[in-house]
Amino acid sequence: MMSNLVEPSWRLLAASGGDTVKLFDVSADSGDPCVLSYTPSPGCAVNSVKWNHTNLVVASTGEDKKISLWRKNGQSLGTVPVTGKDGGDSAEECLSAISFSKKGSRYICSGGTGQIVKIWDLQRKLCIKKLKGHTSTITGVMYNCKDEHLASVSVGGDLIVHNLASGARATELKDPNGQVLRLLDYSRSSRHLLVTAGDDGTVHLWDTTGRSPKMSWLKQHSAPTAGVCFSPSNEKIIASVGMDKKLYTYDSGSRRSSSCIAYEAPFSSLAFGDNGYILVAGTSNGRVVFYDIRGKPQPVTVLHAFSNSEDVTSLSWQTSKPVIVNEKNYTSEMALLGSTVEDSVVIPDPLPSTTPSASQSAMAPGSRGVSASTVNASSVEQTPNRNHLWPSGPLGRLHALRANDSYNDDMGVFSPIIDVSSVEKWADSEGYNNKDHLVVDNKPSSLLFPSSSKGYSFGDNGSKEHPIFDWKPSSTSKQDDPRAAFSSFGSITPTASSKSEDSALTPPEAWGGDKFSEKFNQLANEKFSDKFSHLHAPSRLAVSSTGASTSGSMFSSSRDFPLSHGQTNFANASLEFPRIRDFSSTFETSSTQTDNNLPSSPLFTKGITAPGNIDSLRLSPNFTRRFSTYAERISTTSSFSDGASLSLGGSPKIKKTGSETREEVLNHLLARPETVVATEAGAMPLMNQGGLKQSQTDQQQVMGSSNFTLQLFQRTLEGTLDSFQNSIHDDVRNLHIEILRQFHMHEMEMSKVLSSILENQAEQMKELKLLRKENQELRQRL
């Protein structure tokens, strides 16, 4: 008869009594339905049993102070914590209840006499989180339907809802009658709806966003309640059994009990089948009774599961939607965890990865249970979100707050104001602003753009480099080093490290230019013309957009000078440095100074001919230093000579004001981008001791590098903005949810206050009417 009421996928029922766990095949029409019987720890009573999500493993716990795992074929998978392992995770307590997480079987929670809720990682056999707050024995624990919260009840009548994201107590409630709470069940579909029951027979329906029960059935049972649960198919249907030999079903929509079924023995446990109408109850004399709540209030069948002296302490059905595992070819770990191990439900990730990174370490216990991750210099954590313009690879992910950041969150709502740390403060605290880093750049190309990760830490390891290097160079770098001087003036083009020839970035020689060392040795000994001594930089490191734009625009009228180079340098500098106009505005002021400050300006005697001539150029903020001696100015001349070479046909006598120079460069840059690219590709000759060398291969390489630079910057920026937009969207949504939750709580409180005010007003109106009536009677008598 039972074969018509259950499906093959969840036909097995686990039951515990005394120190034994038994599995029953309720679909068997004849013969012994018990398919397996085992004793986890002889002599130790079993208090709770649960099926995992694959329907292949049963977890049980009790007075043996551990969680035992058994496959349905009778094979033991060990215990948690591991027997004999001295890792500080020993339970050292009698466990009353266990519960798997809703999304998978890797994590299981437990509670008992230790007054602490523990979350165990069954893959690593370790306790990864401890949730405190109770002051008495914990009798029930359970995850909510979204694995966001974990509720627990205790003998002291406390109901605590723990936030798994922060580890904080989201809600602390107390039974209104002060009864001993022993039972707890969460709704299968509502995140904040749960039911509790205890020793005085009262059943409470709670909305955990409020401060009091949403609904109560006071002393429904005349003896302690032994079991309570929601219907899996309809959260408005609740069932409970008690030691008064009664089984009640409730309809929360009508606020009353809908049926009552009596039995010959006291009940001791209860479980709903996944179809929503098969109800199984255990009794104190070892029986397991099956009911169909749609039919007559009589048992469908009764199993003699245990002896008459043993209570059926716990019941658990298999799930109707198990995680599919190939039973012909699977390991013990697959039987326990499934074919794929789910992400951590202890700390939800704002941007979860589809596959765990190889550089991530396993989750370690901590104050917030955050999975510690290590970010290598050659690889960054990836996110599956991709932009349609960035199909070639994943983007660097935005990181939320890590475990070492201190803040308390009641509902795990991510806030961009609270959770995102300041980049400048972070760099100062790590000492990066005092580090000499301008000469060599070994960072990967994904770190060349600060906008892709600004405001987010790259991981818990503070020793890793940060993209702040690309836009905030050190003020204490060596000014006498010509390479340091030129490496402070940057370009958007990703440049290879001068010390890393096997870098993944394209080296300058691949673009058609010479190595930095060769060019430096060649140009350091050249003599410079003094025809432009009236033009000078305000300091030794004044390689700013002023110099770049002036050197390009001064020779724009000459047919022999490659105009596109100056424009390209100005465009590149403008793209990377938003405040380039602040530096370029100093040109007019500097041009009016006397020629005694700088006898010759080598920067303007020779134009830069190719982007490959210099390894890396970065902009330096040191623009205020003045020269005090003639020797210092001469050394400055040598510092600038390594990146400068003049086109042979350029006319050095053309002079323009700073405003004209900027206007002309900007007009060429904005109005003729195609011409700039074409000119840059075809008119950038390589100089070697005054000789002109040019080839078709060099032109193609330069054109390819320019297009690659623009596309790389555009796609990286678009991908970063897309990820940031998604993050902001999630933050706003979470904020709206939090606002609604707070509004609901205040609404409940205000409704109670208003109802009490209305009651007082009604009483006062009655008294007023009585007084008027008495007043009229007195007037009539007088």
From Swiss-Prot:
Keywords, comma-separated and alphabetical: Centromere, Chromosome, Coiled coil, Cytoplasm, Cytoskeleton, Kinetochore, Nucleus, Repeat, WD repeat
GO CC annotations, alphabetized: kinetochore; kinetochore microtubule; microtubule organizing center; nuclear envelope; phragmoplast
Transferase keyword on record: no
Organism encoding this protein: Arabidopsis thaliana
Disulfide bonds: none
Protein name per Swiss-Prot or TrEMBL: Protein NEDD1
Coiled-coil stretches: 753-782
Expressed in which tissues: Expressed in root meristematic cells.
PROSITE patterns with a match to the protein in the record: WD_REPEATS_1 (PS00678), WD_REPEATS_2 (PS50082), WD_REPEATS_REGION (PS50294)
Region annotation (Disordered) ranges: 350-393, 467-512
Spans of repeat WD: 1-34, 41-80, 90-130, 133-172, 176-216, 220-260, 262-301, 307-358
Domain of life of the organism encoding this protein: Eukaryota
SUPFAM superfamilies noted in UniProt: WD40 repeat-like (SSF50978)
Knockout-associated phenotype: Lethal when homozygous. Compromised asymmetric mitotic division in dividing microspores resulting in abortion of gametogenesis.
Any GO MF annotation of the entry: gamma-tubulin complex binding
Chief site of localization: nucleus
One GO biological process term: regulation of mitotic spindle organization
Function description: Regulates microtubules organization in a centrosome-independent manner. Required for the spindle to be positioned correctly and for the function of gamma-tubulin in organizing phragmoplast microtubules. Component of active gamma-tubulin ring complexes (gamma-TuRCs) associated with cortical microtubules in interphase cells. Mediates gamma-TuRC recruitment to the nucleation sites and is important for determining the ratio of branched to parallel nucleation. May mediate the localization of GCP2 and GCP3 to the nuclear envelope.
Compartments where found: Nucleus envelope; Chromosome, Centromere, Kinetochore; Cytoplasm, Cytoskeleton, Phragmoplast; Cytoplasm, Cytoskeleton, Microtubule organizing center
Stored PANTHER family: PROTEIN NEDD1
Compositional bias annotation for Polar residues: 352-362, 370-386, 488-498
Lineage per the UniProt record: Eukaryota, Viridiplantae, Streptophyta, Embryophyta, Tracheophyta
The gene coding this protein: NEDD1
